[in-house]
Amino acid sequence: MDYLDLGPYSSASGTVRLPGSKSISNRVLLLAALAEGDTTITNLLDSDDTRVMLDALGKLGVKLARDGDTCVVTGTRGAFTAKTADLFLGNAGTAVRPLTAALAINGGDYRVHGVPRMHERPIGDLVDGLRQIGAQIDYEQNEGFPPLRIKPGTISVDAPIRVRGDVSSQFLTALLMTLPLVKAKDGRTVVEIDGELISKPYIDITIRLMERFGVTVERDGWQRFVAPAGVRYRSPGRIMVEGDASSASYFLAAGALGGGPLRVEGVGRASIQGDVGFANALMQMGANVSMGDDWIEVRGIGHDHGKLDPIDMDFNLIPDAAMTIAVAALFASGTSTLRNIASWRVKETDRIAAMATELRKVGAIVEEGADYLVVTPPQRLTPNAAIDTYDDHRMAMCFSLVSLGGVPVRINDPKCVGKTFPDYFDRFAALAKA
């Protein structure tokens, strides 16, 4: 097995320019593909998840011209030209869920599949929502999970569509992005949420990007969403992908644990991503944080004793960035509790179980529940722990931070960061110092 040995490091400082946001990149690619006109996308993330989206769009007949981190997408005016396609989408939820919805109304015969873990990640609530408007979608293996077979359906919207909100916000994102292309009786489509909607900031990203392409969604709280029906997306001409706020979390934490000053560029006060809220969680733990419109800087911890304060917080809004807090909790002066993180269980791996297992390897006492994690840091970190990453990019990036505790750490299968941040370890090593 490939591995990477990091540290021991005693400090981290410098400036890092973030790669483009995964969440924004894949949404913008699909919106541009469905729009009228050409869209020039800049700062597009180059990673496994964006590559599978680009490959799929190419197979569906979308004209794409790539040059570095710029991509010109020629829109299809709401309908893909290819009426049959076999689409392998890796482990990219941001590709599988929205594309499934777009294909369901495209009147073609499609197969959607991915890596084995993708076939364990739920999609049943989205399929149920699409079947309510007449979509023909069959499960090839297990009910509620990919691979999927999508066939032409008689699509009509004559009642509100109901979808669960407590498993993944990507189901709602997929419906919101697709439904404006469908004709409806009274010229509008309504989506109603059953239960609590998780990861609300990601829905905010979807709505704001749809608006850039000329379609406005109105929401009544977080339970009811109304969009115009039978309309076309219009290209904004140019759109820049802001830096990835989830990826920023590792460097911001490094600036706290390694003394800083460490500045990330590409996200800040003006960001549309909820994960910039990670900076607030770090501040609650005692880190010195300052922020501009498109930068955030951390200068160590504001205590003489050099330890973070423990935190007890609901992370429903920022589940991805919360993983970084779980590792930062190793450097706290007491026990931290991460609450409302049930969605971790259906991500790239079961992140609650994986995080608990690997935190114990470095000496922490960990209690895991259905939707929470309690982390008590050790007196001193266990050196030379071999961290398993479960083919999960965020596990690998999170546990790089252990090396800032003055102990070496081994990261198994470091290439899994290719999902969102292929050169992460090079960037991290450039900022960390012995």
Curated annotation (Swiss-Prot):
Residue positions binding phosphoenolpyruvate: 22, 93, 121, 170, 351, 394, 419
GO molecular function: 3-phosphoshikimate 1-carboxyvinyltransferase activity
EC number, UniProt record: 2.5.1.19
Entry's family note: Belongs to the EPSP synthase family.
InterPro entries: Enolpyruvate_Tfrase_dom (IPR001986), Enolpyruvate_Tfrase_sf (IPR036968), EPSP_synthase (IPR006264), EPSP_synthase_CS (IPR023193), RNA3'P_cycl/enolpyr_Trfase_a/b (IPR013792)
Source organism of this protein record: Burkholderia ambifaria (strain MC40-6)
Transferase is among the record's keywords: yes
Pathway(s) per entry: Metabolic intermediate biosynthesis; chorismate biosynthesis; chorismate from D-erythrose 4-phosphate and phosphoenolpyruvate: step 6/7
Subcellular localization(s) per the UniProt record: Cytoplasm
Keywords tagged on the record: Amino-acid biosynthesis, Aromatic amino acid biosynthesis, Cytoplasm, Transferase
GO-annotated cellular components: cytoplasm
Statement: the UniProt record of this protein carries the keyword Transferase: yes
Function: Catalyzes the transfer of the enolpyruvyl moiety of phosphoenolpyruvate (PEP) to the 5-hydroxyl of shikimate-3-phosphate (S3P) to produce enolpyruvyl shikimate-3-phosphate and inorganic phosphate.
Catalyzed reactions: 3-phosphoshikimate + phosphoenolpyruvate = 5-O-(1-carboxyvinyl)-3-phosphoshikimate + phosphate
Positions that bind 3-phosphoshikimate: 22-23, 27, 168-170, 199, 320, 347
Official protein name in the record: 3-phosphoshikimate 1-carboxyvinyltransferase
Catalytic residues (UniProt): 320 (proton acceptor)
GO BP terms, alphabetized: amino acid biosynthetic process; aromatic amino acid family biosynthetic process; chorismate biosynthetic process
Subunit: Monomer.
